[in-house]
Amino acid sequence: MAHKKGQGSTQNNRDSAGRRLGVKKYGGEVVIPGNIIIRQRGTKIHPGKNVGMGKDHTIFALVAGVVTFHRKDKKRQQVSIVPAA
């Protein structure tokens, strides 16, 4: 017969690493084609002119220029690039 009780284990001691989401290039910053502007889950910010959107909703630059953020309508925000002349 055992004289010591078995050790219990905790259940809630797991945590995942942060996903490094957010704005990577802010308004007024200069970008080149392929630069990631925003990493996001879902379309929190929508793509505008001269930007593309990846399958994970990452917004990236299609042309060289300056990043601008603006409102599409009351609810939706949009990011575009003003091409470098």
Swiss-Prot record:
Region (Disordered): 1-22
GO cellular component: ribonucleoprotein complex; ribosome
PROSITE patterns registered for this protein in UniProt: RIBOSOMAL_L27
InterPro entries found in the cross-reference section: Ribosomal_bL27 (IPR001684), Ribosomal_bL27_CS (IPR018261)
GO terms, biological process: translation
Superkingdom of origin: Bacteria
Molecular-function GO terms, alphabetical: structural constituent of ribosome
Coiled-coil portions: none
Keywords assigned: Ribonucleoprotein, Ribosomal protein
Gene3D superfamilies: 2.40.50.100
Membership in a protein family: Belongs to the bacterial ribosomal protein bL27 family.
HAMAP family the record matches: Ribosomal_bL27
UniProt name for this protein: Large ribosomal subunit protein bL27
Organism the protein comes from: Sulfurimonas denitrificans (strain ATCC 33889 / DSM 1251)
Protein encoded by which gene: rpmA
